[in-house]
């Protein structure tokens, strides 16, 4: 839909005052009725009619995090693990094989869905953030309530924007709810529905600003409810944001990681299996609110996740949908890495073998599956302490503080019942950097981190361009990885709707 503005403006004028944002060819939010609590009484922002409406809108954000598993978790696993050396696509479908073969193009339908969903989530957060400003200005909400809800909304928005920044490099920065279009203002207002993509620095500055607001005003960390946007959640995300190339500041990574590590009630689970375990007697996950969880999404009987059966058997219903090839199949390269390390503790919680009726990548009678989401009742972790400890280790290594980095890595290895790093793994700066990256691979496999680790450390070409020689079971790589591979293509559907967007280089 190129030149959408020029080709539709006459029709919009004809619609006159009855034409609203809901009628646009491009819908910034999926349904305004979902996002606007109360009525729209001006042309500036959606109105939250009272405090109760604001509380409902905040609840909506948490429900999006919980229920929209496609872009909040599943597709990040595909990008993070299938697009790296951790996993194969698993099926022959176009949803996953392009990631395995480095052939993702702008027509990829799931990438298009993710772009639209992320913008929809940002729009929902903006309704809360802007609506709270109105309520606060009118004295309809207390100072404490205003800051607490505002902080949670901004953490949510920044989480969405950070995902977009890591996938596409940059995105259209939208912080306001668009005005209602009328015949009188259409030429001025219509372009605001189609903003250009901002530069990466601008995107990251807003992400940092939102997380810093959350760090100041969000609720304190609650050990008995780790599903909430808390100060510790904001600090953890800041540690990860400052590790990225655009703003890279290793001292700040250490600063915010230390805030997280020193949070009372936050510590590594003594047993790795507790994070992922299934209790067959109670037909439930082993534990919610695990001691190392910073932000998790929880599921219960009657309200389970569906994502588990995308990867393997869902243990609460053993044979459910186990009749088609599953996604994110563990790679030979990853399994070999675990085995070389002698890391049975984590391997056995990361990979499981079943008999199945397909043999896409392995013999059907001994087929490996991703095991970190093994039932519809297991937690999905958005942030956990081991990740932040290893982010700090990475930063210490790049700062030249090698012993500090080694100590942190050994802390993670100890929980996995592995010996401390051998002397050859700690002898040089590069050896320590390699050891941290390797430890992150084993600790965080199938948590959607590996691809982003390689991008952040600028090691994509090193690990991925020789992957077919290391891993004979992988589909052929169709294109070599290069400097343009670090960002995925902006979906063609988004470009068609918005002439102000420009495609990422190389696509």
What are these regions (language model features)?
Residues 1-33:
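Bacterial Sec-dependent N-terminal signal peptides
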Residues 22-78, 257, 478-507:
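Membrane-proximal, proline-rich intrinsically disordered regions
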Residues 46, 50-51, 55, 59, ...:
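Conserved, well-structured interaction surfaces
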Residues 72-94, 171-177, 181-183, 219-311, ...:
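Short, surface-exposed recognition loops and adjoining beta-strand edges that mediate ligand/DNA contacts
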Residues 89-114, 181-194, 285, 319, ...:
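Short, solvent-exposed loop/beta-turn-alpha elements that line the ligand-binding surface or hinge
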Residues 142, 170-201, 205:
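Short coil/linker segments at helix-helix boundaries
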Residues 177, 330-385:
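Flexible, polar/acidic helix-loop-strand segments at domain edges
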